[in-house]
Amino acid sequence: MNNFSIISEYKPAGDQPKAIDEIIAGLSSKKRSQMLLGITGSGKTFTMANIIERTNRPTLIMAHNKTLAAQIYSEMKSLFPKNAVEYFVSYYDYYQPEAYIARTDTFIEKDSSINEQIDLMRHAATRSLLERRDVIVVSSVSCIYGLGSPDLYYQMMVNLEPGQSYLRDQLLNDLINLQYERNDIGFERGCFRVKGDNIDIFPSHYSDKAWRLSFFGNELEYIHEFDPLTGEKLAKLDKAMVFGNSHFVMPQETVNNAISGIEEELQKRLEFLKSQDKPLETQRLNQRTQYDLEMLTETGSCKGVENYSRFFTGRHAGEPPPTLFEYLPEDALLFVDESHVSVPQIRAMYNGDRARKKVLVEHGFRLPSALDNRPLKFEEWDKFRPQTVFVSATPGPFELEETGGTVVELIIRPTGLLDPECIIKPATNQVEDLISEIQTTIAQGFRVLVTTLTKKMAEDLTAYLQELKYKTSYLHSNVHTLERIEILRDLRQGTIDVLVGINLLREGLDIPECGLVAILDADKEGFLRSEVSLIQTIGRAARNSAGRVILYADKMTKSIDKAVSETLRRRQIQQEYNEKHGIIPKTINRAIHALAEFEKIDSKLDKKQAHTLFDNPAKLKTHIDKLKKEMLKAASNLEFEQAVKLRDQLKTLEAAALELS
């Protein structure tokens, strides 16, 4: 068994050693919930990593959106290169759930686009949890949604070992039951092909490696890992475990039992609808369900099979669905990052899902059992979660109640950076004053973040600043993923000096070059100007030793008073620590340097691969098309650095293709 091992030049410092010891002591004393109050720049992720290494327990880290999940995943991946660090988020690029609008008699069919790369990573996550213990899974709230039963998923697994005998036809049939597709021409993930005595399998958890099974009669002689693009052998394997190409694979016996259960519920529901004098709903439900039953009988699956998941897992009505939490071992550890946002999000998921499906059931589009294909209720999540460490700079009421108000503080930054100075100015003529402050900040070589209350004001302010010749951009929810990383990179590199936003300039935005955060209309109490929102926004200036925050307000609200007081308290604690240890605060610009190096190195193709591609125009075109798809997938998956890298590779290859033509 592998143990967790951090590979880093840094050691815990500041508040980190004390926080790590306190959390581990709490875990050892069987505390179910603990609160890690970690401010911006205090090294929350590094602290979590050290807790994982010391406890040596499989870990799930929940974040409230894909951006933060991807950021934590990337950091954990670099800290634990020898261990399994996995990524588990929703695999939909686009998702329109089926719905019915009664007032207009409009039925909206389910429409979705699955991101193959994320689907691959989800399979890698569940596979790692079933195969090993040194696993860290970084997930969004997607982990509370229904997933295939881990028992069936493991039961259906095909175990392959050289020297063992396998009936060829039975093995091929087993692969088909795992929802692998036989394709002797287009060999891609989730497919297998047969060539003479060889069977090639492209596993669901790989994108660039496949397995070749070499037989002599019925005996499996060798298993080789190879590159599906070039055919080059990469390694010889002692064994291989083939898991399902879907998390909803199941043996035929389970399918047959489920069909019986569905038929029984269908008859009861049809009788009920008839008794309610609903002939249209009766006919609709019978037609739709009979079609699904026919598909299940013939193929073992159907469109929307997840709506019948209760029958496949043998659960009763109202019981929680299997989720990623059932794949976790009993001694697993859970971190809930930015818990002040994540916990309310978990609480809200169930009600929204049920309201939509209830309409579908009432109007004969689905059986009542579809209501059991759902996310966990908050109470169920609370029951299933293992020992938990909530992490936030601004803990919410649930976390404080669970921990009895006791928090483990992570306030002192090893870098010595102070919380920013907070200045309160009148909101009257705030734009004119802001322009003066922007000039001062830009002259110092820093960048400016401005947060407004409305989209209209953000757009107008951006246009006004651009008219005044300030290099300004507007970050909003409609900005595509790749554009977002380009905007942030342009801001860091100085192509943009001012970035205007509404609610996107809070958690997870790491801009060390930011010398000023301006909060317009700070005295307008509400969600965007609450104590939590203000503290999070103020934290955006905490990466810069000269960082300042200006709150434009005509009156002192309770939120402003509490946020500024808490910031001052943290600032004083850091100042005392710096004086005691002789630390001079200094801005660290390591991240942008690392990004530049990342692009510089990875934009270059492997020489051997480039030579092969450039000598074959047809193969070059195929590779260009493949890279375009991967770039779009990376962008949708919020893997910004990967998307930029692929874009730069594409430029090189397209230039080469033009020369060859």
Curated annotation (Swiss-Prot):
The keyword Cytoplasm applies. SMART domains: DEXDc, HELICc. A motif (Beta-hairpin) lies at residues 91-114. Keywords: ATP-binding, Cytoplasm, DNA damage, DNA excision, DNA repair, Excision nuclease, Helicase, Hydrolase, Nucleotide-binding, SOS response. Residues 25-182 form the Helicase ATP-binding domain. Gene3D superfamilies: P-loop containing nucleotide triphosphate hydrolases, UVR domain. This is UvrABC system protein B.
